[in-house]
Amino acid sequence: ILSRFSKAHARVTVEIVSGDAQDLALMLANGELDIAILTTGGGAPLEERDRLLLEQPLAWAVHKNGQCLKERPLRLAVARVGCPWRLAALDALKYAGIPYQIAYLSNVSESQLAAVRADLAVAALPFSRIRNASQPICINDELPKLPYTQIVLRTAVNPSENTKALAAQILSAFNRPE
């Protein structure tokens, strides 16, 4: 994406900022960013300027041969308050009457997966993130069903022509029409 954009817009400086969806959305709203790729969850309504890039189910990541899954309260690795994946996991467990304990906090999914690999916790993450994780992580279907998560492209309220061009490159890479 960036290579194609750079070839067509060689004089444009691109600064990449990584962070959680809440922080990026706030930075976009405050005019600190021109464009953001954000995750949502639980079927939350999208903003008018959001463009859906990808939708996939959340799933439970567990240690393949671990004991953590059998323990109660169920030990969780989650992101901070406000993360839609965290909210989906806690709501599903609460609705199913499964007691839980937040054991590990990290806004980085790889850190959550490290807790799962060590059989210290389970985590609710996008299906593709679990499927692509190294062993001994697998997907568990004994825990309550989780909702879908979306990855969306959001631009500033009044995007520049360069921002529109980058957005078009991103949408094209995800096979989404402009």
Feature roles, as predicted:
Residues I1-A44:
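Central regulatory/effector-binding core of bacterial HTH transcription factors
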Residues T13-G19, P99-V108:
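Short beta-strand-to-loop elements that line the ligand-binding cleft
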Residues G19, L33-T39, N107, A123-P126, ...:
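Short beta-strand and adjacent tight-turn residues that come in two discontinuous sequence segments
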Residues L28-A29, A89, A114-D119:
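Hydrophobic residues within well-ordered alpha-helices
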Residues L38-V81, Y148-N158:
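Hydrophobic/proline-rich hinge and linker segments of small-molecule sensing/allosteric domains
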Residues P45-R51, R117-N158:
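Beta-alpha-beta core module
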Residues L74-A96, T163:
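Secondary-structure junction motif
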Residues R154-E178:
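Extended ligand-binding regions for polar small-molecule ligands
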